[in-house]
Amino acid sequence: MNPADADEEQRVSSVPAHRCRPGRIPSRSAETETEESSAEVAADTIGGDDSELEEGPLPGGDKEASAGNTNVSSGVACVAGFTSGGGVVSWRPESPSPDGTPSVLSLTRDSGPAVPSRGGRVSSGLSTFNPAGATRMELDSVEEEDDFGASLCKVSPPIQAMRMLMGKKCHCHGYWGKFRFCGVQEPARELPSDRNALWREMDTVSRHSAGLGSFRLFQLIMRHGPCLIRHSPRCDLLLGRFYFKANWARESRTPLCYASELCDESVRRFVLRHMEDLPKLAEETARFVELAGCWGLYAAILCLDKVCRQLHGQDESPGGVFLRIAVALTAAIENSRHSRIYRFHLDARFEGEVLESVLKRCRDGQLSLSTFTMSTVGFDRVPQYDFLISADPFSRDASWAAMCKWMSTLSCGVSVSVNVTRLNADVNSVIRCLGGYCDLIREKEVHRPVVRVFVDMWDVAAIRVINFILKESTSELTGVCYAFNVPSVLMKRYRAREQRYSLFGRPVSRRLSDLGQESAFEKEYSRCEQSCPKVVVNTDDFLKKMLLCALKGRASVVFVHHVVKYSIMADSVCLPPCLSPDMASCHFGECDMPVQRLTVNVARCVFARSDEQKLHLPDVVLGNTRRYFDLSVLRELVTEAVVWGNARLDALMSASEWWVESALEKLRPLHIGVAGLHTALMRLGFTYFASWDLIERIFEHMYFAAVRASVDLCKSGLPRCEWFERTIYQEGKFIFELYRLPRLSIASARWEALRADMLEFGLRNCQFLAVGPDDEVAHLWGVTPSVWASRGTVFEEETVWSLCPPNRECYFPTVVRRPLRVPVVNYAWLEQHQEEGKATQCLFQAAPAIQNDVEMAAVNLSVFVDQCVALVFYYDSGMTPDVLLARMLKWYHWRFKVGVYKYCAS
């Protein structure tokens, strides 16, 4: 007998009989799994059986389970591509197939599923997970993956590693899942009779949080916390501190835990190289985060339950999270070929100074990654980006390779944008398949991805999508959001009161999609109306049904010709099939594009008046309160954001396939957003109506600093991006010159000097600002999202916690589950509200009341945003599509690229 067959037979015989599914062989060869994977994915993914999953304490007893320090992977055998070292399971990449063909999901060389490769067949050398020596918890997790996405794990082993990293073991029972505790009770609706006794009990339990005390403290916070915050918003910070204390006994406070094999190799080397200095830096960071951090209850839930991970059975500490982020970014800067130039622009001589600079920006909340990237950066086999824009023409057939690519991306928690009207498949079937799988992912993962479905409104398939949204609301997919690509010809016909609008089949609509210029599109559209088969609809009815879908809260509007007309592309380009899922980033290429978000916290540029000499500087804007806004600090933050973004792009391209590097090198896009704009205005004592000039100045300085930093990188010796000659920058133009010429606050001599340097040296990047929502990042730092106004002084947000029972016997689908809602406090209002019961001193206005002011401010700032601005529209329950249609026409005349990001009931 072959020795390999003998080992396989021994592993099969060691599997307990009660763990084997009836009618299925416990363990099969890799070749058999590969041949049957494409046939089993649909059944295992969509129709998996959850009846065999069992829950209960670990065999080690209640004491071991409640302690919460059992190694998750201590019993995993070292077989079939998985190696066990130091109690940590790590996936080792298999050798390529004999014929040298890459696998369908061999996305990266050194990291997890980044961007799927274009083609090829499934490799036959995929590793399998052997549960022979695993513990009961690990066996449960293996069976859960068989029900949840076993076939995808067989095709893409990095997803298996992603599961091991993203999962957590609860501290109360030892269950393997996504939360640190089980059983969230229904929040109390009334205050307790003796609030002082409740606070004393919380304080007593927090002092003895080891063992089951942390679970008791968690129950008290979840039970009475929301009601206490509604009654007294000031107790939000105290509840956030108690929420952190519930995790103190199980936190890993040593930075040496990041030398684990779960972390990226560059991070491990950096930690081992600086193992003498990092403990002191970690201690200072933990003390700063604990004392200076403004952590309310909702921010604490985001930090501990979305950002922090478990390593070797212990949770990350908040200070350790920021240290890991800083180490990962520093390693990306140092491992780049241009590290010396990056250090020069960061004003750092060696990597220790780079680490201190990056750590200061991260822990202060001045520059922030997305919450998803904050939770995954620095780890091995995980995505290094936030979103994926699917624009690959090879995916038009919507074949198994394309569906597997999108599902693999969703399995890793990354949101995807897909244009279904340009696929050679039934649009409703694709929506059901991707939406159903996305809902399964959202049930299992803390980071809930979405599928943004884009629909071309000149394709006849748009009628089917609209009917699907309106008629199948009972089985609505929670993970699917829609976006309608509205052409200019449709808006012009509605304005001219023309009643006939034509929709074409897929070949004609694709031919129209290749015409990005508005005049060429209208000319070809008129010709096709005369010579091609078409479906004629009423213009008013068609638009009203489209906006009725938008009023359901799951559809956005994109003026697709404005996206091309007011873009940085000088040559004629095709109409982009889709934007990013957050409706902020544009992509004009024909390859899948990963998006890396980076947010600048504008509220961190507001300071108290202490230095009288600095108040007379030209970059200082005095407020009505004892505060001022410093534009020079804002430019410094944007400059560092450009350096960070280029280093992250270098790291992503070095770990990806050649065609991903080629796609990113064309424009080297930086997706820089903002947060805390309304918070900054309230702290300065300004209303939104009186701040239009200040908002325009803020974005002018951001755009100037971004272009200046990109030019300086080329001036230092870096090559310009490949498509620089195809952009308006080659002609010496700036993005605001495509609109009306605004009143610039920066001296014209500085703009002309920048123009001359740009023509001489070029640009390292050609896309800079993308104003997305970034709401989770904003709530993490206690500021308002993006350029949006605050919804109220105290408002509620959904958390990752669910109120349904967690056990399998009481399983509820996603549409029945009720998420726990926690009040969020507007701290800019709370700072000025000195005593309870007195009128507030700051000028606060809720978002629905100043919606028109926010829209006008967006018109002014959009001239400096080279990508898109995502807005929120608040509507009343009695609003009709006619009213929304009139507002949509106004958005079109204001030259918005994205009419609205999402709709919210006021």
Curated annotation (Swiss-Prot):
Compositionally biased spans, kind Polar residues: 98-109
Keyword Magnesium attached: no
Function: Does not possess a ribonucleotide reductase activity. Betaherpesviruses probably use another strategy to expand the dNTP pool in a quiescent host cell.
Organism annotation: Human cytomegalovirus (strain Merlin)
Record GO terms (molecular function): ATP binding; ribonucleoside-diphosphate reductase activity, thioredoxin disulfide as acceptor
Keywords: Host cytoplasm, Late protein, Virion
Family (UniProt): Belongs to the ribonucleoside diphosphate reductase large chain family.
Protein known as: Ribonucleoside-diphosphate reductase large subunit-like protein
GO cellular component terms listed in the entry, alphabetical order: host cell cytoplasm; viral tegument
Region (Disordered): 1-70, 89-129
Subcellular location: Virion; Host cytoplasm
